[in-house]
Amino acid sequence: MSSMQFSSVLPLEGKACISPVRREGSASERLKVGDSSSIRHERASRRMCNGGRGPAATGAQCVLTSDASPADTLVLRTSFRRNYADPNEVAAVILGGGTGTQLFPLTSTRATPAVPIGGCYRLIDIPMSNCFNSGINKIFVMTQFNSASLNRHIHRTYLGGGINFTDGSVEVLAATQMPGEAAGWFRGTADAVRKFIWVLEDYYKNKSIEHILILSGDQLYRMDYMELVQKHVDDNADITLSCAPVGESRASEYGLVKFDSSGRVVQFSEKPKGDDLEAMKVDTSFLNFAIDDPAKYPYIASMGVYVFKRDVLLNLLKSRYAELHDFGSEILPRALHDHNVQAYVFTDYWEDIGTIRSFFDANMALCEQPPKFEFYDPKTPFFTSPRYLPPTKSDKCRIKEAIISHGCFLRECKIEHSIIGVRSRLNSGSELKNAMMMGADSYETEDEISRLMSEGKVPIGVGENTKISNCIIDMNARIGRDVVISNKEGVQEADRPEEGYYIRSGIVVIQKNATIKDGTVV
């Protein structure tokens, strides 16, 4: 095995992009700028150049060489940047959402970030895991409505789940009634941060925080936030918006942006309609390298992910726009006129879980082969509550394109293109197709099940010979025998709480703890 040597060269002048190079014989292959592997190589080389102490203080270039033959030589060249973004100088604020009306009835007893997704995760696990995988471990979660299950999940997963915070922390800040206020609830995204500005200010002074990362708790994506923060630092931006290309059909659901050739945002329009929407169209051909047929995505949408300079955020919320309550609709459109507001275009998978339809479609997409998004990645895993459940037990089942979580009991059933949550029970002859079953909080013993059935009651799970399609089944639902749930008549909207279900965008949603009696047809 050849030995490896490290050599530092003189500081470079100027500012350039990352350019790691692997030499193989006489050829050189340049890694794509922004590629995750190149970013990891860059960070590793900085640590080696700086004795493992984190970001280098100067522009020293690190060259990794070998005493092997020239054909085997590996040169890792990190181009100069004046300032490397340090995750220790970043604090993340995750917004817990409002009343959750768009995801009702899933939010009838829980906050939006606590809604289960992907079989065993919660929506809050997405930004939390992205933070940890990005090296950001100073996190505030702001909650208000129905926050009990969210607080419990955060405590079990991130405060007692074995995750190593080193010098970091996770703090839950709940909306409270303040003296002299007419209402204690957050009146918007900016107002949520403003209500706890005194907590954040005290924290910033003690922890040398320079950048504030604002995140949403109702989205599905995997992102290295430090790439976003690095662009923020490189551009000397006051505010940086993470943006994504979107198509015509959903463009009016988002805040849309336009930016110039330097990346500076010159126009921001919150959920435009009609002519205002048409005016926000842009030429997205510059995304040819990243997505197929960019002409299908003629709009650039704000993801609701922002980076602020600390002092800029404090000034905007306390002084400049002290009476404004929302970042997207009020503060950002005004701030871009006298602040350096930059755009960071994110081209990987991103889904805003804003409605029952988008939530259902995002979950069903996880079942596709190959899926557009996967929770599993050994280098950037998603964390969730450790439940210590046994593997799922199945007997004579037919399963196709499905995700089956831990601790389930499946007996002579058929599952197709569906997600089955933890502790689910499906009995003989039951069929699920295009369905999401969230599972149960606890098991019922065989004796308990026998007793319930002898009393004419329904145990937790799906009963014998029940057929379910295009449906979301919330936690602890009790669905009897010979039930058919398919919305055969194509009803788009319906409220049937007394019968245990709602219909939203044609999707039947069985309520949490609902009981659907034997023989019911929906």
From Swiss-Prot:
One of its GO terms (molecular function) is ATP binding. Abundantly expressed in the whole grains, a slightly less abundant expression is seen in leaves, while a low level expression is seen in the roots. A greater expression is seen in the endosperm than in the embryo and pericarp layers. GO terms for cellular component: amyloplast; chloroplast. Its EC number is 2.7.7.27. Insensitive to 3'phosphoglycerate and orthophosphate. Residues 28-54 are annotated as: Disordered. It is an enzyme of class 2 (transferase). This protein plays a role in synthesis of starch. It catalyzes the synthesis of the activated glycosyl donor, ADP-glucose from Glc-1-P and ATP. Heterotetramer. This is Glucose-1-phosphate adenylyltransferase large subunit, chloroplastic/amyloplastic.
